[in-house]
From Swiss-Prot:
This is Biphenyl dioxygenase subunit alpha. Keywords: 2Fe-2S, Aromatic hydrocarbons catabolism, Dioxygenase, Iron, Iron-sulfur, Metal-binding, NAD, Oxidoreductase. Belongs to the bacterial ring-hydroxylating dioxygenase alpha subunit family. InterPro entries: RHO_NdoB-like_C, Rieske_2Fe-2S, Rieske_2Fe-2S_sf, Ring-hydroxy_dOase_2Fe2S_BS, Ring_hydroxy_dOase_asu_C_dom, Rng_hydr_dOase-A. It comes from Metapseudomonas furukawaii.
Length: 458
């Protein structure tokens, strides 16, 4: 990839169907802050992503409260692979491929529920809640040698593929790769920023309001990057009308200033990132209203959160936080929407979103969270529409030839972030920056070009 935008204007696109490590490394230049647009639209790159990114990363599936009782299940995805997340008799959680080992039909066709077993609707192979094959119709007649009495068919060998499962403070993640680092190592120095939403109270968190799902015709990286690194859009054009519309009538519009104080965090490894405003709660008030804002900043719940987390960072001074855990887990603490961007080819995603609240929050506060998330960050939410419109139009442009012929600029805050911030841990810079985005794309490039954990691991 050229080191200068001017040098490549009008240059021909280099079409690649067999992506070598060298070619992939040329797609992202974090030192110069340049991105090759083909990372968002190339089919062959996407197919490699399914193997090297989604086949090796820890992926968010849901929350422990989605499957509270034995046999409770949630059918979801890891990349494009359908999986089932099931609560076991010993209260652990298993995740296995939603695929019958006979001809590949799904063994679970419900979104969620409770089951004692999963039976394939094609030929009737049945699996227990641990994913063990327990019944095959006409097993003796069809698979056994009647003369010798030796069946030669071992059901224990024909269960669905099992994923690794780990939880972090209520969130359930899974990973196909046995060589990948454990979840806490994978999350690394991003964990304190996750705790701002997940660990405010000893009671933990609970999911409310069900799982909302919708489709956006855009590449998954646009969504993941925005939640990882992009406060810029919220403070400039995209959400200003929605913020003004959501302000309480008693709030003076002259106080609706665009915040200027804040920071951005880039994970030391892993492509995770976060950003937030400092000491400026006006945007939270406009998005979530006075009751949630007061709950988050004042009173017993805020005091308890400060006691639990204040030794790490001044959580009471943080507002409007956004965050992504690479590759596709994103959330907004205080607003408390959390979602997974399930990829559906290079040009489409399914958004699966739910609302998370403190388990011991008053019923009134839980209802406020549910109501405001429907209004703001849901399939019909005002801010969700703003974001989706931008991503869709970008993706439309990338259908063209010239649109993929020159690099995109990711140079905001280049070289300015550093460790040693007095208030916030890790690599921290100014809120209006793209350091976390550069970290995300650099890690994407490494996962795509380094097939071995021997070089990729933290």
């Amino acid at each position: 990839m050229s080191s200068s935008i001017k040098e490549v204007q009008g240059a021909p696109v280099k079409w690649v169907t067999n992506w070598t490590p060298e070619a992939i490394r040329g797609l992202v230049d974090q030192e110069k802050g340049l991105l090759d647009p083909r990372i968002y639209a190339d089919q062959s790159l996407y197919e490699l992503e399914l193997e090297r990114v989604f086949g090796r990363s820890w992926l968010l599936l849901g929350h422990e409260s989605h499957v509270p009782e034995t046999g409770d299940f949630l059918a979801t995805y890891m990349g494009e692979d359908p999986v089932v997340m099931v609560r076991q008799k010993d209260k652990s959680i298993k995740v296995f491929l939603n695929q019958c080992r006979h001809r590949g039909m799904r063994i679970c066709r419900s979104d969620a529920g409770n089951a004692k077993a999963f039976t394939c609707s094609y030929h009737g192979w049945a699996y227990d809640i641990a994913g063990k094959l327990v019944n095959v119709p006409f097993e003796k007649e069809a698979f056994c040698d009647k003369k010798e009495g030796d069946c030669g068919f071992d059901k224990a060998e024909w269960g669905p593929l099992q994923a690794r499962v780990a939880t972090y403070k209520g969130l359930v993640f899974a990973n196909w790769d046995v060589q990948a680092p454990d979840l806490e190592t994978y999350l690394g120095d991003a964990r304190p920023y996750m705790d701002v939403m997940l660990d405010r109270t000893p009671a933990g968190t609970v999911a409310i309001g069900g799982m909302q799902k919708w489709v956006i015709p855009c590449n998954w990286k646009f969504a993941a990057e925005q939640f990882c690194s992009d406060m810029y859009h919220a403070g400039t054009m995209s959400h200003l009308s929605g913020i003004l519309a959501g302000m309480p009538p008693e709030m003076d519009l002259s106080h609706a200033q665009v915040p200027t104080k804040g920071n951005q965090f880039r994970a030391g490894w892993g492509g995770h990132g976060s950003g937030w405003f400092v000491d400026e709660p006006g945007m939270l008030m406009a998005v979530m209203g006075p009751k949630v804002t007061q709950y988050w900043t004042e009173g017993p719940a805020a005091d308890l959160a400060e006691q639990r987390l204040g030794h790490t960072m001044p959580v009471r001074r943080m507002f409007g936080q956004h965050m992504s855990v690479f590759p596709t887990c994103s959330f907004l603490p205080a607003i408390n929407t959390i979602r997974t961007w399930h990829p559906r080819g290079p040009n489409e995603i399914e958004v699966w979103a739910f609302t998370l609240v403190d388990a011991d929050a008053p019923a009134e506060i839980k209802e406020e969270y549910r109501r405001h998330n429907i209004r703001t960050f849901s399939a019909g939410g005002v801010f969700e529409q703003d974001d989706g419109e931008n991503w869709v139009e970008i993706q439309k442009g990338l259908r063209g030839y010239k649109a993929k012929s020159q690099p995109l600029n990711a140079q905001m805050g280049l070289g300015r972030s550093q460790t040693g911030h007095p208030d916030f841990p890790g690599n921290v810079g100014y809120v209006y920056a793209e350091e976390a985005a550069r970290g995300m794309y650099h890690h994407w490039m490494r996962m795509m070009s380094e097939p071995s954990w021997a070089t990729l691991k933290p």
